[in-house]
């Protein structure tokens, strides 16, 4: 039986007076992903941010490896928001290096260059991010996924602004992450062609 990594029980959140969701319960085991679906405004991003500890819930509890979230949880988390966390004044390579450094991941330069090659940014690695398209900025985040060893990925609309080739690479990267025992929580409008025994669905606003 796979290790239970994340447990969410009785979660509820409001936006002002409006109730976004309530009584949300789920678990995520090693080697599996949960895809959160729902219309715009249903609370998908709020749910992800609440799980990560970035938004305080109105009710409920989130536990990691059977305990309250703390430094250990933050050290094992990779959060990718709806907009890529890219600094305009830094190059693609510098942004990647900075993101990995903040995560405490020591990655040799040759591996960073290989990841930038995989995502089609190697020849643009020295360009300031402000000169990159939205899709290219998303590819920096994809390169981080390839390199970051964090076991738990929380990704908000990870396929947005990626072309077909980059989407396919992201899905292969996610599949490999799950195959080696990682876990993921995703908010997405897309059907993810991953093994059915690895992916479950949660619909908000149904």
Question: What are the functions of these language-model segments?
Answer:
Residues 89, 128-135:
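Conserved ABC ATPase signature
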Residues 57-75:
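Conserved ABC transporter NBD signature motif
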Residues 83, 88-104, 111:
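Q-loop/switch helix immediately C-terminal to the Walker
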Residues 142, 181:
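Hydrophobic anchor residue at the start of the ABC signature
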Residues 97, 109-124:
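Conserved ABC ATPase "signature" region
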Residues 153-157:
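Catalytic Walker B motif of ABC-type/P-loop ATPase nucleotide-binding domains
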Residues 52:
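Helix-to-loop junction immediately C-terminal to a conserved catalytic motif
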């Amino acid at each position: 039986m796979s290790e239970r990594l994340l447990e969410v029980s009785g979660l509820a959140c409001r936006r002002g007076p409006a109730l976004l969701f309530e009584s949300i319960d789920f678990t995520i085991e090693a080697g599996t992903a949960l895809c959160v679906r729902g219309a715009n405004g249903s609370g998908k991003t709020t749910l992800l941010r609440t799980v990560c500890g970035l938004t305080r819930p109105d009710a409920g509890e989130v536990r990691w490896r059977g305990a309250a979230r703390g430094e250990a949880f933050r050290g094992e988390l990779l959060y990718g928001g709806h907009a890529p966390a890219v600094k305009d004044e830094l190059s693609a390579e510098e942004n990647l290096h900075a993101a990995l450094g903040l995560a405490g991941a020591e990655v040799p330069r040759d591996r960073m260059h290989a990841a930038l090659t995989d995502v089609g940014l190697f020849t643009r690695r020295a360009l300031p991010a402000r000169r990159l398209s939205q899709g290219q900025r998303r590819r920096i985040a994809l390169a981080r996924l390839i390199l970051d060893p964090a076991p738990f990925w929380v990704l908000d609309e990870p396929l947005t602004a990626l072309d077909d080739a980059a989407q396919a690479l992201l899905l292969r990267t996610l599949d490999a992450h799950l195959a080696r025992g990682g876990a993921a929580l995703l908010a997405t409008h897309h059907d993810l062609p991953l093994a059915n025994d690895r992916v479950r669905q949660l619909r908000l606003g149904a």
